Amino acid sequence: MNSIYRLSQLKQLEAESIHIFRDAISQFENPVLLYSIGKDSSVLVHLAKKAFYPGRLPFKLLHIDSTFKFREMIEFRDRFVQENDLDLIVHSNQEGISAGVNPFTYGSRKYTDIMKTQALIQALTAGKYDAVFGGARRDEEKSRAKERIFSFRDKFNQWDPKNQRPELWNIYNGRINPGESVRIFPLSNWTELDIWQYIRLEKIQVVDLYFARPRPIVERDGSLIMADDDRLPLKPGETPQMRTVRFRTLGCYPLTGAIESTARTVEEIVAEMLETRLSERSSRIIDHDGDASMEQKKREGYF
């Protein structure tokens, strides 16, 4: 009797992502993987290692350090890279650092442009990368929902959402002119729940900030901001209070809101995800900048 072999949903997503990695490597000469330290980046690196096992990754990791990441993120990054024998490039906008750019006095929009978008463009230009892997997913935000898996960028690293190439089935067009590049998103068809279920299945390590712990929190403009270091200026009457919270998404600590939660394990996070109705990026302050929307940021070069 013939048996029928079927892949589970997670294994289908895994196979698609591995195919995207291998297809991209066959088409591009100088790729790099943007490593943001979050859960999606951890899954992305895990999939890349599977795609090219038993060899080492055929590209380096690139981290854009805005200087305001959570301290736990930087500690995790350094340990993760060492334990997995990875080549990591860390880049910061030195002009922004010299000018003292920060999210408090410059505002989230200008700070993000200088310390993230401009820093990313600097690093990509210096490295002359023709392909950049990223962990963005279509379920995160509406501008990402309409973006291709192979997302074309012009010689200025800018994205034109009205000038996207058709993607038929699993056929990806990587043909570009000199100076142009492609952003590649192997996790495009994954959801936040898929990510956590895969983390559970594969026992992937992630930053502890994703799990509920007592943390020093200031409630500001409806967001729960963690006082991660003494650079956070407190307003009159503000005092950090210990509250049991976790983060669904990670970024710069002054611009990333926590959620109250009791989910202390991956299993409990999966159970929480089955009930939530809010987008994970609803707690990212930079996504609520009005005319500085995510789509506008992406047009200007943001990932």
Swiss-Prot record:
What pathway annotation does it carry? Answer: Sulfur metabolism; hydrogen sulfide biosynthesis; sulfite from sulfate: step 1/3
EC assignment: the record states 2.7.7.4
Listed under catalytic activity are: sulfate + ATP + H(+) = adenosine 5'-phosphosulfate + diphosphate
Q: Does the keyword Transferase apply?
A: yes
GO BP terms in the entry: hydrogen sulfide biosynthetic process; sulfate assimilation
**What keyword terms does UniProt attach to this protein?**
ATP-binding, Nucleotide-binding, Nucleotidyltransferase, Transferase
Assembly with partners or alone? Heterodimer composed of CysD, the smaller subunit, and CysN.
- What's this protein's function? With CysN forms the ATP sulfurylase (ATPS) that catalyzes the adenylation of sulfate producing adenosine 5'-phosphosulfate (APS) and diphosphate, the first enzymatic step in sulfur assimilation pathway. APS synthesis involves the formation of a high-energy phosphoric-sulfuric acid anhydride bond driven by GTP hydrolysis by CysN coupled to ATP hydrolysis by CysD.
**Protein name as annotated:** Sulfate adenylyltransferase subunit 2
